[in-house]
């Protein structure tokens, strides 16, 4: 049961884990649902717990009474992943139910190019925040499960180029029932492919036949370290307590 207080998780939770990795001091898991195990205390914990509510793909995190801090939290996205180590990599929030809560990222490169990695659910507030950063020039889709609202984002940013592997491109009559046939750059073969200097797409089949990871070298991330965006097939296992691979199906 949810801890007594203003914040709670309702029965619409789909157990995607978003809130639990974002704010583990507030959210936990019971059976196949998340719940509030401890009400947040202090402005820092409250902001993180509310950010998880914004990111929740099903809007399952609610409040008993209006939360004064919520407006500022909504306006805080995109959130830095690690301002010291990866100052140009951000968490977009606004996870989509159609991608089962997959995490979307933003890479803001030194030349002014902004790349989304996997699509969040569409939000006009997030779109305005992205416009203030110069818009979005690339949408890098790791695989077919995580395309979410890519069509609506393309409508908002018409010059944006979407990228995914041709083996994962589907029409609206196939899982996940989202039309991908209009994706501008459909990668063929085994790669790797250069998106931009310092940004490569690497074919990593397994989770799906067309799964692709995107490697951004250190200069693009603004630090001494690069970033590898892997989609769903590489994850942290809470059960095992370590990094692990999702089940291989089409290696």
Predicted regions and their residues:
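A detector for short, charged/polar N-terminal pre-domain segments
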Residues: 1-2
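Cysteine-centered iron-sulfur cluster-binding motifs in ferredoxin-type domains/subunits
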Residues: 7-23, 41-59
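Conserved small-residue-rich
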Residues: 12-13, 82-130, 134-143, 153
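Short cysteine/histidine-rich zinc-coordinating motifs and their immediately flanking basic loops
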Residues: 24-35, 66-71
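Zn-dependent metallo-beta-lactamase
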Residues: 45-111, 157
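Residues that act as N-cap/strand-start positions at coil-to-secondary-structure junctions
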Residues: 99-101, 181, 187, 208
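Metallo-beta-lactamase
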Residues: 112-116, 121-124, 137-138, 160, ...
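Active-site HxH/HxHxD metal-binding segment of metal-dependent hydrolases
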Residues: 122-197
